[in-house]
């Protein structure tokens, strides 16, 4: 398995509870697809440098996780189905040893 980091930008329209439910759902997707979440860093609501989908604010969450490379396309497909997830970026941190 490889080590990845995902940074998520989530709609500011959500309540704190709905925001928590959304990022916990992303964690659940990682685990259901054979991955392991190692660290979750919730940055909270931040002002954006430029509007994204007409929003000037958004919630940020950064997660580090181990994940099988073969499951990455399915994970990205599931992320795209989440309407309140405005943007995400997945970065490979370390290759397999």
Curated annotation (Swiss-Prot):
Q: Name one GO biological process term.
A: translation
Q: Which domain of life is it from?
A: Bacteria
UniProt keyword terms in alphabetical order: Ribonucleoprotein, Ribosomal protein, RNA-binding, rRNA-binding
MF terms in GO: small ribosomal subunit rRNA binding; structural constituent of ribosome
Query: CDD domains this protein is in?
Result: bS6 (cd00473)
Q: Which InterPro entries match?
A: Ribosomal_bS6 (IPR000529), Ribosomal_bS6_sf (IPR035980), Ribosomal_S6_plastid/chlpt (IPR020814), Transl_elong_EF1B/ribsomal_bS6 (IPR014717)
Q: Name one GO cellular component term.
A: ribosome
For this chain, the family text in UniProt reads: Belongs to the bacterial ribosomal protein bS6 family.
Q: What does this protein do?
A: Binds together with bS18 to 16S ribosomal RNA.
Return the protein name.
Answer: Small ribosomal subunit protein bS6
């Amino acid at each position: 398995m490889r080590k990845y980091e995902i940074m998520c930008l989530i709609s500011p329209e959500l309540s704190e509870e709905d925001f928590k439910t959304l990022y916990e759902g992303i964690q659940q997707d990682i685990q259901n697809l054979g991955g392991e979440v190692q660290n979750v860093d919730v940055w909270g609501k931040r002002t954006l440098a430029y509007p994204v989908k007409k929003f000037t604010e958004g919630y940020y969450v950064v997660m580090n996780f181990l994940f099988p490379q073969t499951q990455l396309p399915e994970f990205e497909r599931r992320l795209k189905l989440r309407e309140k997830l405005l943007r995400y970026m997945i970065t490979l941190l370390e290759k397999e040893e």
